[in-house]
């Protein structure tokens, strides 16, 4: 009896050398130690099932895994194992983004033919855990807006209904439309994994010259100024032109301005009185929009030099406004913009009544 008990104890100790859900150990090169249960072992019998099983391991960010291949033809299995590694790395979103290589060990587990899988990642575990989910491009854009608002330097997201998008242009547009949020336009680097498909990982890196802490402090200063501007023209009893003019006064009389370019345009303009034509036009347009007034930023030239100015709306009419024209708040029609050149097709005609949209219903 003592000999039998000793043998049973030895068997129990040996079973501790087999795989569990997190990792596996192998005492011999080509044998997978048996366990008491096979509930956690998926069974695969063809390439699609093999791909899905390996993909599931990668999806979880697991380092090791295993699968039963009891019903898999041995000749096909050997060929498919070498192919599935390439397929996962090239075709699967997480595989393309984070997997360096995949190793396989053919043996037995729970008395069945099985394959052990070891995944070697090129990314740290926290990077994999930090991937955000986006069901479509609208959600992806929301995540980008949140990243810019928080002044974060990176966003990695998995977009399951991916569409080709100019992310650099999207960041530039958001920054131009929200100078109360984006203090500095970052340098944007975008990588997409894999190269094709509807399900992809998008890795966006944002490089700032200013520290995140400083950018957040700038936001705290700038945002109340925009709120004050809205309150300054909160009376809707005043006509649109009066409100545009009041916002002009609010901005232009705030500082004795020096016309220079800054990497933090809205903050430098509102706090230090330093800004260029682009900063004035962008900040003024944002103040107008937050007050419920329609306002565009126009990019063009004046006498051959780069120039930005605004277009505002009064009823059915649009007008040009150049805050740095040295002439005060004056509304201009298109034919009065001497020396200015812009893309006429990109903006509404100014000084001409707008035609109502045709109703095809």
Regions found by a protein language model. Give the residues of each.
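N-terminal accessory/pre-domain segments preceding catalytic cores
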Residues: 18-236, 350-361
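Mature secreted bioactive peptide module from preproproteins
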Residues: 169, 173, 177, 201-203, ...
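Periplasmic OmpA-like peptidoglycan-binding domain that tethers envelope proteins to the cell wall
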Residues: 269-278
């Amino acid at each position: 009896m003592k000999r039998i008990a000793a043998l049973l104890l030895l068997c129990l100790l040996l079973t501790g050398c087999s795989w569990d859900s997190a990792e596996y150990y192998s005492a011999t090169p080509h044998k997978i130690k048996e366990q008491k249960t096979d509930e956690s072992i998926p069974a695969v019998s063809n390439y699609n099932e093999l791909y899905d099983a390996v993909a599931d391991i990668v999806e979880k960010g697991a380092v090791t895994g295993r699968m039963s291949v009891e019903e898999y033809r041995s000749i096909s299995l050997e060929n498919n194992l070498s192919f599935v590694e390439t397929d996962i790395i090239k075709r699967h979103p997480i595989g393309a983004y984070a997997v360096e290589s995949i190793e396989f060990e053919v043996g037995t587990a729970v008395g069945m033919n099985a394959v052990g899988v070891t995944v070697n990642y090129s990314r740290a575990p926290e990077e994999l855990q930090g991937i955000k989910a986006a069901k479509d491009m609208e959600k992806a854009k929301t995540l980008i807006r949140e990243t810019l608002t928080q002044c974060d330097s990176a966003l990695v997201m998995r977009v399951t209904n991916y569409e080709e998008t100019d992310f650099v242009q999207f960041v530039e547009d958001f920054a131009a439309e929200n100078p109360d949020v984006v203090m500095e336009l970052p340098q944007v680097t975008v990588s997409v994994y894999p190269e094709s498909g509807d399900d992809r990982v998008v890795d966006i890196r944002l490089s700032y010259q200013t520290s995140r802490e400083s950018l957040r402090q700038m936001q705290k200063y700038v945002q109340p100024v925009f709120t004050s501007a809205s309150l300054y023209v909160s009376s809707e009893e005043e006509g649109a032109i009066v409100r545009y003019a009041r916002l002009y006064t609010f901005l232009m009389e705030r500082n004795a301005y020096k016309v220079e370019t800054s990497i933090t345009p809205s903050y430098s303009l509102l706090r230090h009185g330093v800004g260029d034509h682009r900063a004035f036009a962008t900040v003024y347009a944002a103040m107008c929009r937050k007050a419920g007034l329609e306002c565009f930023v126009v990019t063009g030239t004046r006498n051959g030099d780069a120039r930005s100015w605004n277009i505002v709306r009064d009823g059915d009419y649009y007008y040009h406004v150049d805050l740095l024209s040295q002439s005060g708040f004056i509304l201009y029609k298109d034919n009065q913009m001497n020396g200015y050149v812009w893309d006429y097709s990109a903006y509404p005609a100014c000084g001409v009544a707008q035609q109502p949209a045709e109703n095809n219903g």
